[in-house]
Amino acid sequence: MKRYTIIGNGVAAVGCIEGIRSVDARGPITVISREQYPAYCRPLISYMLEGRADQEQMPYRDAAFYERMGCDVLLGGDAVGIDPEARAVELGDGSQVGYDALCIATGSSPFVPPFSGLDTVASKHALMTLDDALGLDAAIDATSRVLIVGAGLIGLKCAEGICGRVASITVCDLADRVLSSILDAECAALMQARLEEQGIRLMLGDSVERFEGGLAHMKGGEDVAFDVLVLAVGVRANTALVSQAGGEVDRGIIVDNHMRTSIPGVFAAGDCAQGYDVSLGAKRVLAIMPNAYMQGHAAGVCMAGGDEVFDTGIPMNSIGFFGLHAMTAGTYEGACYEERGEGSIKRLFTEDGLLKGFILIGCDERAGIYTSLIRERTPLDSIDFEALKKAATTTAFSAERRAQMFGEAV
């Protein structure tokens, strides 16, 4: 009977478990989880800070999931190495867990820049895990002055989550706009205005030179006093287990379309993996939940001896701040179709007869249709793209195409 081991317990791990069980109903599965909790929905941690969700709403699967799937879960387990020759995972307590097929689903960790004086800050936090959110929740009160370093998705969701619960929020970033990795200047300005309407101070094009206790000396010359610091500068894929075992890594763990690493019997999925991006035509880390699950599922199927390919990954973000919603996907290359409304922008990017990407601000209804066009590399001359530019409806497709893509009756 084949033995399966999964290091990590997030969305990719759940996908892997379900992929394994779609092929092999009996082989033992061991899940090694550094965190003390069953798999949970990580994007909800900012909503927990806001009071829109509680800890009972966090689980990604029901309480009976692991038992139903026949999993042995080692909560609080620390995998410190893998031995490909012995087919074993080494744990921090000196014990080992054997495997016939192994999936690395270790996710990513916050990047902490080497700020001078960071060790003098008494209350500093990240916002990546449930424990991070619980720690930040306990650290703030109505008198807290909060400084957030980083105006990306994590930093801004943190700001939204604690807005109204603290005395002040300042967000700084060296970039000249918020969400600089996914929005252009004009689209970012809409988001910036919404954030500033809520009293959040944004210091863009500026960051910390050094810390001195509860004082941040900024590169621009200003001093910012704070009580609580949140570092949200970015994340790095957790690749060490594979690199230390001699496997190929880059920004993430290099995988093929079956999610196999360069080490025999070892697969990888989720935020730690560097897989194929169909919109780019190359491999890169795609750190979003849908890709993590699908990568995990493909890994699980292949670990169990089946054949599943995941080669339709794309960068994609669905975000919202204080009621203003945005969705982005793909790359922003080629010709741009633009449509504007009051407080909304739609941009569709096309190249070589394909939809390559989009930015939708305040008008993201049925964005899944645009996403499907990118994933499936649908030739635009096979559909009524002029109609789709105005409204993303399935009537722009032929009856046969609707049946193929969306399961609608012909």
Q: PLM features: what roles do these ranges have?
A:
Residues E67-D83, E196-V208:
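A conserved beta-strand/loop element that lines the FAD pocket in flavoprotein oxidoreductases
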Residues T106-R165:
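Glycine-rich dinucleotide-binding loop and its adjacent helix/turn
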Residues R3, V224-E248, F322-R402:
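C-terminal catalytic lobe of FAD-dependent flavoproteins
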Residues I7, V97-G107, V149, F226-G234, ...:
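Short hydrophobic core segments
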Residues T120-D141, G214-H217, E222-A298:
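FAD-site-proximal beta/loop scaffold in flavoenzymes
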Residues K2-D72, A159-L183, I369:
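Beta1-alpha1 glycine-rich phosphate/pyrophosphate-binding loop at the start
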